[in-house]
């Protein structure tokens, strides 16, 4: 049975992301773990102990309310909940000590809070510190059957392919088409190594509907944006690596292009 963590701070945005995740991954053969974290404010020792107990009680209460709401929406869903001390990333890490986790689902706060998202939100904390696939669902995203997914690719050598399993499963279960996109600065012919990596990608997705595409643009973020808009992409997958599209996206100054890309659900894969 797949174990999927649903991160929540009890906000409407988090609830929306949870609903999106359950509709995407389904209820058959899946156990969802709703995770909430709490950290006491800075204060004297006595106040901290008292506040810590209060926060824990409020967290547990919130989880019970959320579980009840979700079981009404999805009657056959398998749910567990965890209320733990620490940042949400550390809480997820604690859960993985006892559970083999397939994926994490978290919400992002949309355009009004994009700067906080890029510069150090809980979602980014999860991506940077938890070595698990993460589905990031933008504020207000409603789930619809997915027909087209893009994978922002580079020519980095991949030793193994197991980390691609969530992407492969989504493409297969949604009967979607995968478009693997490389952004090129010029119309140069691929060298032998690049051609070899393209062939490897083709073989990885051999049983699925897929296409390897090129986008000509001097800026990788603008190139990905142009590609996703032109092809009506509904989900963007990326591999969390340094010095790649992923790194540029999450460390770039806030731009109009980034605000547009933030409207797509992201599937962040950890190699």
Please provide the spans of the model-predicted regions.
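Short beta-strand elements of ligand-binding domains
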Residues: 106-107, 134-139, 266-270
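Small/aliphatic-rich secondary-structure junction motif
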Residues: 1-50, 148-214, 230-235, 261
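Charged helix-capping and loop-helix junction motifs
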Residues: 119-122, 164-165, 193-198, 250-255
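Local beta-strand N-terminus motif with an aromatic residue
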Residues: 1, 100-102, 123, 132, ...
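Short secondary-structure boundary segments
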Residues: 36, 108, 182, 240-241, ...
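Structural beta-alpha unit
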Residues: 70-104, 205-256, 260, 264
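A short acidic, glycine-rich active-site loop
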Residues: 51-61
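Glycine/threonine-rich flexible loop motifs
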Residues: 113-118, 246-250
């Amino acid at each position: 049975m797949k174990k999927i963590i649903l991160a929540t701070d009890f906000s409407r945005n988090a609830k929306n992301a949870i609903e999106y995740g359950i509709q995407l991954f389904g209820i058959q053969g899946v156990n969802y773990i709703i995770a909430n974290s709490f950290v006491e404010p800075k204060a004297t020792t006595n106040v901290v102990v008292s506040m810590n107990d209060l926060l824990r009680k409020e967290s547990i209460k919130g989880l019970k309310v959320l579980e009840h709401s979700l079981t009404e929406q999805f009657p056959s869903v398998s749910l567990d909940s965890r209320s733990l001390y620490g940042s949400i990333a550390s809480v997820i890490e604690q859960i993985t000590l006892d559970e083999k986790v397939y994926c994490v689902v978290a919400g992002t706060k949309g355009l009004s809070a994009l700067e906080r998202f890029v510069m150090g939100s809980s979602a980014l904390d999860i991506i940077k510190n938890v070595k698990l696939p993460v589905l990031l669902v933008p504020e207000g995203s409603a789930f619809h059957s997915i027909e087209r997914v893009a994978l922002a690719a580079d020519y980095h050598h991949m030793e193994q392919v197991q980390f691609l399993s969530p992407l492969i499963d989504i493409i297969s279960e949604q009967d979607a088409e995968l478009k693997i996109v490389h952004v090129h600065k010029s119309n140069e012919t691929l060298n032998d190594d690049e051609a070899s990596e393209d062939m490897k990608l083709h073989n990885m997705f051999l049983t699925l509907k897929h296409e390897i595409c090129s986008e000509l643009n001097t800026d990788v973020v603008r190139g990905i944006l142009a590609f996703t808009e032109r092809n009506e992409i509904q989900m963007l997958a990326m591999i969390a690596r340094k010095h790649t599209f992923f790194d540029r996206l999450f460390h770039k100054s806030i731009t109009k292009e980034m605000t547009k890309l933030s409207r797509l659900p992201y599937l962040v894969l950890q190699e």
